[in-house]
Amino acid sequence: MAAPRRLIVGMAGAPGASYTVSLLGRLRQLGVESHLVTCGCSRSIIYSETGLGLRQLCSRADGWYHERNQAAAISSGSFLNLGMVIMPCTMRSLAAIVTGVADNLVQRAADVTLKEGRRLVLAMAESSSSRIGQENLRHAEDLGVRILVLPPAGPTLTVAEKNEEILACFGLGDAAARAPAPR
């Protein structure tokens, strides 16, 4: 059975909220249902980067979940979807995902996404020069995770291009034909 056109969008903190706001708008344009989960650290950054309050951000998604709600629909493999993107993703969240630790709903939904063989894209807000960080990135890629690095949010064109790259990972958007096939 084909997955419904729905995508889980996680925000794990760090700079990059403008990318998420733009992605939610683009998903709505494409008629793709979006389910947003935010961590506390990301909520504190949203306003400073975008001028939006949490309610305004959540109104751009079809569903919103609190990070502590591990019983949410998106924490179950029976919640059919195209996959998940965590944007921005921190090195801490990456480490939790590759080790199977699920302390919050962002990490739990990522764990379920991998378990179900769905596409997981981590849009890293930072690159790591530490050996541990590099090993975690390699481990994630070995698990089939697509890793992207977010440049500092700047021109609208840069944000739009990165979002099209993310959408293409799921067979969506203008760049879908140029991306590797979703797994």
Residues covered by each model-derived region:
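A cross-family phosphate/adenosyl-ligand binding-site feature
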Residues: 1-121, 125-183
